[in-house]
Swiss-Prot record:
O-methyltransferase that catalyzes the 2 O-methylation steps in the ubiquinone biosynthetic pathway. This is Ubiquinone biosynthesis O-methyltransferase. The keyword Methyltransferase applies. S-adenosyl-L-methionine binds at residues 44, 64, 85, 129. Its EC number is 2.1.1.222, 2.1.1.64. Belongs to the methyltransferase superfamily. UbiG/COQ3 family. Pathway: Cofactor biosynthesis; ubiquinone biosynthesis. GO terms for biological process: methylation. It catalyses: a 3-demethylubiquinol + S-adenosyl-L-methionine = a ubiquinol + S-adenosyl-L-homocysteine + H(+); a 3-(all-trans-polyprenyl)benzene-1,2-diol + S-adenosyl-L-methionine = a 2-methoxy-6-(all-trans-polyprenyl)phenol + S-adenosyl-L-homocysteine + H(+). It comes from the Bacteria. CDD domains: AdoMet_MTases.
Amino acid sequence: MNAEKSPENHNVDHEEIAKFEAVASRWWDLEGEFKPLHRINPLRLGYIAERAGGLFGKKVLDVGCGGGILAESMAREGATVTGLDMGFEPLQVAKLHALESGIQVDYVQETVEEHAAKHAGQYDVVTCMEMLEHVPDPQSVVRACAQLVKPGGDVFFSTLNRNGKSWLMAVVGAEYILRMVPKGTHDVKKFIKPAELLGWVDQTSLKERHITGLHYNPITNTFKLGPGVDVNYMLHTQNK
């Protein structure tokens, strides 16, 4: 099954889906195209768990879960995890890897808007990592995430800022020079300024709690969280 056979929805970019379908079989290859995701996952997981006050016993939704790197790690923390994605092949990889790892994650091929229509207010934590820049209407995703979380629950977003530096680092550097990710992975026009994301958040029931940058040092080949949101950044919000 390919991206064109996925359920129809206005907020799906089939070209974006096809990119990830093509490399889905290598999602769990620690030295493959998704090596950066494996490298930053401990940072993402640590940030989410700390800001949410732990994940054990919580009901968590991972929006745009892909092959399940973050979803599995949150399940290992004791969360009950549902992973959403519109890519059939990435979900098949995620399901197989979870089975092989003995990890329980419920993977669903569905848009977040469709899921919100049926499961509003059911999750303690919602995560949406590196997904907003891959859909036609990211504001619609933000609205749906707000609808899905319980009162007092936590919603986390991560994406890329839109400016010259992020183009140099995430496109020229990561795709063409360092070849950390496949060429064509990113479109700088789809990157999202923090002010834009915060503006969408302000139009929902969510409230900003914390924002941090995710930084890569090519000399030491390491990632870290810290001040500065000029390239990659993560946002923690909470439902009012």
